[in-house]
Curated annotation (Swiss-Prot):
The glycine cleavage system catalyzes the degradation of glycine. The P protein binds the alpha-amino group of glycine through its pyridoxal phosphate cofactor; CO(2) is released and the remaining methylamine moiety is then transferred to the lipoamide cofactor of the H protein. Disulfide bonds: none annotated. Keywords: Oxidoreductase, Pyridoxal phosphate. Its cofactor is pyridoxal 5'-phosphate. It comes from the Bacteria. This is Glycine dehydrogenase (decarboxylating). The glycine cleavage system is composed of four proteins: P, T, L and H. GO terms for biological process: glycine decarboxylation via glycine cleavage system. Belongs to the GcvP family. The modification N6-(pyridoxal phosphate)lysine is found at K704. The keyword Nucleotidyltransferase does not apply. CDD domains: GDC-P. The keyword Transport does not apply. It comes from Vibrio vulnificus (strain YJ016).
Length: 954
């Protein structure tokens, strides 16, 4: 290539698009922090003993166009065939108004979990709609705002039954007609809780002494039966009964809640979310009022703001793992907010009548198929069904299945049976094609006419739904596309996302989610595949997954990866299981002590508790490092039973601990394993790696370091990497499992497969040099922010040379003592300046943790620093008595447009200071839509359903 051609090459252009500061800005920043060069800063920050000895070996960086061409080759290897497998996954139509305005819209997918409710009212409303939808369709009292997938929700239901029940039994009963992938995830969870899983016929439940049970309704083979008596008899025996159900079926069949279920779980996938070869999808859980504080996952509640107006918030947050730690109800952190929002909008768009029509059509098509088959001499396993039939095909099974495959049709292959599931996309042509496979000569129209006289004959009368659902006005207002488009925009406008400005949340890595990375997500070649389709039809997914795993191994220094875990917390769980199985394989199953530094993320102790480990806390010194003396003492005390240590690197205090290799060596010498939490991998890539440091296993947050967007609270992915000795203990899967069939942690083998292309695309476009540069720039940005703020705020922890890693902790405690202004006041005041708050009170109470990421440019960093410095000056005015402590811009923050227009302004500061405190806000202003939300009121007056219409009229 000539010199001119080389100079005009745009192959590496993406790196400059992804990283915020250009070269000139980097030089200014380096001057501000007194570093000679970027490499000099890295040398001062990252301990020499953990620096990689050679660069990562990855393919040359690709341009956006080349990357999309490469990923299209993977997509083209996938074969999208007509699929009638069912088993919890169905084709669906994603309404285009939702596809374009939500799934493909950075205003929705780049937001963070709504911990700051004043700037999250839009998606809080949508998630409240989701809860209302689930409550209505299941017939239950309260629902959460989503879980990771149906199988995980079932495992969570099991632990809820154990916590909430009065039985002393250790048995959990699972009906043998529950989806097989769900049973496997339950078995994994039960093993480490010490529960005995008994699998049997539904009718055996009342005779089984069990603390809890899981039934499937309709069953995995499609049967619809009245479970009322079975549930009542089990409950009389102190058994809490959970039921896995189908939301679309619940539009026609009697809801599980009306049959007496204590817990109802399932997946909302078929409400407009593509199958995506397994995910991501929003699961749900609903329960009775008395179990609300035992229910895992996030719950949206109705509260009031400082003016007494209705405001939404996440309720009962004290149940969450970051507060309860090893006593938490679950280790769940990431949920599936974006997918829950899509499902809730599906219900809003269609309403009761639309959902019922979709259900009627699906059922009618199934009834036509069943009638044609039975008239042609085939026997059905069940004559009562909604959308799924199972045909007793005996010795013809393999021949019929092969005939279907030859016709490019996927059916469910069972032992001597074939299953067929229909959905909203099923056509008359599909039925004709199936009739041809089974040599049925009947006419679809004639069969339809016969059935019309008794449309619901296949649903037993006791199982027919008579109650209304989706009667709230929100589900009966937005049925034209214009109405829906405006409703979606109205909600989006209430929320702060990366489209508005920096989200400097420490430990969350809110970096750019580039448009090019997102494009393949909605391609049907990735979206329309059933996770249990024959593996050869998913050759593209297999190749992409293997290539991504190889890339991740190179980046992390590990030898093997599993992509199955659907979140960081799920990855932690899979990683600790791998450690425990390894110990068991060596006859050391007694090793159950997990050492966790006091600075650790709350998920760590919560996960350790889920694997029945005894958590022993290791002290940190005054600089935030692991106290080696205390570590040595704890290792000596627990040496015989030491299983592992869980560390985060760089530490959650935002520094590179010098002695991390020594920590690993000490634990290994005592027979333990090292779990390195990958939450802060964004400060490692290309500079060091978990494998090089000496760790045995890590999860990676693909939704942090590797650019999968946070989606306003999910999806996420938490794949785990391991050294070779732990590779045999990675999660398996009953369908297409590469690592064997046991110890699954997710419903599908590749977890949320359809978002894997995002991380693959990011790595492909950055290349080894680009990824390394991103890490360096993330460190530069953090140190720049730290140095600009240090004259005004105490910085809690810094490394040996006075540097921080990719985030820094600002200590508000001494300032609160001095001025009376808290970290919460600062967080809320930042909203007036057009920012999302940093992480509050983690890992140290009374602090703010700031992580700017590499994607923010110098102008945005300065805008943030200027806002923080201005807020510090406002605090001084409170201290000096210019503004009273109980009435100032900080304690009254955030301010809304309604505040600005108040006729009576009874505050000692002008409206301009309240609403336009900086020059930047006069140019462009994001407005919170409510005043400060009253958390105490919300939890004392818990309402987790949609408010009445009068609240909207106000």
């Amino acid at each position: 290539m000539t010199e001119l051609l080389q100079s005009l090459n745009t192959q590496h252009e993406f790196v400059g698009r992804h990283n915020g500061p250009n070269h000139a800005d980097q030089q200014k920043m380096l001057s501000t922090i007194n570093a000679e060069s970027l490499d000099a800063l890295i040398a001062q920050t990252v301990p020499a003993q953990i620096r990689l000895e050679k660069p990562m070996q990855l393919a040359e960086a690709q341009s956006e166009a080349d990357m999309l061409a490469s990923i299209k080759k993977f997509a083209d290897l996938n074969q999208v065939k007509r699929t009638f497998i069912g088993q919890g996954y169905y084709n669906t139509f994603t309404p285009n108004v939702i596809l374009r305005n939500v799934l493909e819209n950075p205003g929705w997918y780049t937001a963070y979990t709504p911990y700051q409710p004043e700037i999250s009212q839009g998606r809080l409303e949508s998630l409240l709609n989701y809860q209302q939808m689930v409550m209505d369709l299941t017939g239950m009292d309260i629902a959460n705002a989503s879980l990771l997938d149906e199988a995980t929700a079932a495992a969570e239901a099991m632990t809820l039954c154990q916590r909430a029940g009065k039985s002393k039994s250790k048995v959990f009963f699972v009906a043998d007609d529950v989806h097989p992938q769900t049973i496997e995830v339950i078995k994994t969870r039960a093993k480490y809780f010490g529960f005995d899983v008994v699998i049997g016929n539904v009718d055996a439940l009342p005779q089984t002494e069990a603390f809890g049970a899981l039934l499937q309704y309709p069953s995995t083979t499609g049967e619809v039966r009245d479970l009322t008596d079975v549930i009542a008899q089990a409950q009389a025996n102190k058994t809490l009964v959970s039921v896995a159900t189908d939301l679309l079926a619940s539009a026609l069949v009697k809801p599980a809640g009306e049959m007496g279920a204590d817990v109802v779980i399932g997946s909302a996938q078929r409400f407009g979310v593509p199958m995506g070869y397994g995910g991501p999808h929003a699961a749900f859980m609903a329960t009775r009022e008395q179990h609300k504080r035992t229910m895992p996952g996030r719950v949206i509640g109705v509260s009031i703001d400082a003016k007494g107006n209705q405001a939404l918030r996440m309720a009962m947050q004290t149940r969450e793992q970051h507060i309860r730690r090893e006593k938490a109800t679950s280790n769940i952190c990431t949920a599936q907010a974006l997918l829950a929002n899509m499902a809730s909008f599906f219900a809003v768009y269609h309403g009761e009548e639309g959902i019922r029509t979709i259900a009627r059509r699906t059922h009618h098509m199934t009834a036509i198929l069943a009638a044609g088959l039975t008239k042609s001499g085939y026997e059905l396993a069940h004559n009562a069904f909604f959308d799924t039939i199972t045909i007793n095909t005996g010795d013809k099974t393999q021949a019929l299945y092969a005939k279907a495959q030859a016709a490019d049709i996927n059916l469910r292959l069972l032992d001597g049976q074939i299953g067929i599931s229909f959905d909203e996309t099923t056509t008359v042509a599909d039925i004709d094609a199936l009739f041809a496979i089974f040599d049925v000569k009947e006419s679809v129209n004639a069969l339809s006419t016969d059935i019309a006289g008794n449309e619901f004959a296949a649903i037993p009368e006791a199982c027919r739904r008579t109650s209304r659902f989706l009667s709230h006005p929100v589900f009966n207002t937005h049925h034209s596309e214009t109405q829906m488009m405006r409703y979606l925009k109205q909600l989006e406008n209430k929320d702060f996302s990366l489209t508005h400005g920096m989200i400097p949340l420490g430990s969350c890595t809110m970096k750019l989610n580039a448009a090019a990375e997102m494009i393949p997500v909605t391609w049907p070649e990735f979206g329309a595949l059933h996770p249990f389709a024959p593996i050869e039809q998913a050759a593209g997914y297999t190749a992409l997954a293997e290539d991504l795993k190889a890339k991740l191994c190179e980046i992390t220094g590990y030898d093997a990866f599993s992509l199955q875990p659907n979140s960081g917390a799920s990855g932690e769980y899979a990683g600790l299981i791998a450690i425990q199985r390894y110990h068991e394989s060596r006859g050391e199953g007694h090793r159950n002590v997990c050492l966790i530094p006091s600075s650790a993320h709350g998920t760590n102790p919560a996960t350790a508790a889920m694997v029945s480990m005894k958590v022993v806390v290791v002290k940190c010194d005054e600089n935030g490092n692991i106290d080696l003396v205390d570590l040595a003492a704890k290792i000596e005390k627990h040496q015989e039973n030491l299983s592992s240590i869980m560390i985060t690197y760089p530490s959650t205090h935002g520094v590179y601990e010098e002695q991390v290799k020594e920590v690993c060596e000490m634990v290994h010498a005592a027979g333990g394993q090292v779990y390195l939490d990958g939450a802060n991998m964004n400060a490692q890539v290309g500079l060091t790696s978990p494998g090089f440091i000496g760790s045995d296993v890590s999860h990676l947050n693909l939704h942090k370091t590797f650019c999968i967007p946070h989606g306003g609270g999910g999806p996420g992915m938490g794949p785990i990497g391991v050294k070779s000795h732990l590779a045999p203990f990675l999660p398996g899967h009953i369908e297409n499992g590469v690592e064997g069939k046991e110890f699954a942690v997710s419903a599908a083998d590749l977890g949320s497969a359809s978002i894997l292309p995002i991380s693959w695309a990011y790595i492909a476009m950055m290349g080894a040099d680009g990824l390394t540069e991103a890490t360096k720039v993330a460190i530069l940005n953090a140190n720049y922010v730290m140095e600009r703020l240090r004259p005004h705020y105490p910085v809690l922890y810094r490394g040996t040379n006075g540097r921080v890693a990719h985030e820094c902790i600002i200590d508000i405690r001494p300032l609160k003592e001095e001025t009376g202004i808290s970290e919460e006041d600062i967080a809320k005041r930042l909203m007036d300046y057009g920012f999302h708050a940093p992480t509050m009170s983690f890992p140290v109470a009374g602090t703010l943790m700031v992580e700017p990421t590499e994607s923010e440019d110098l102008e945005e960093l300065d805008r943030f620093c200027d806002a923080m410095i201005a807020i510090r000056e406002e605090m001084t005015k409170v201290k000096n008595g210019e503004w009273p402590l109980e009435n100032n811009p900080l304690v009254n923050a955030p301010h809304t447009q309604v505040d600005l227009m108040e006729e009576q302004w009874d505050r000692p500061y002008p409206r301009e200071i309240a609403c336009f405190p900086s020059a930047a806000t006069k140019r462009s202003k994001y407005w919170p839509t409510v005043n400060r939300v009253d958390n105490v009121y919300g939890d004392r007056n818990l309402v987790c359903s949609c408010p009445g219409i009068e609240n909207y009229e106000e």
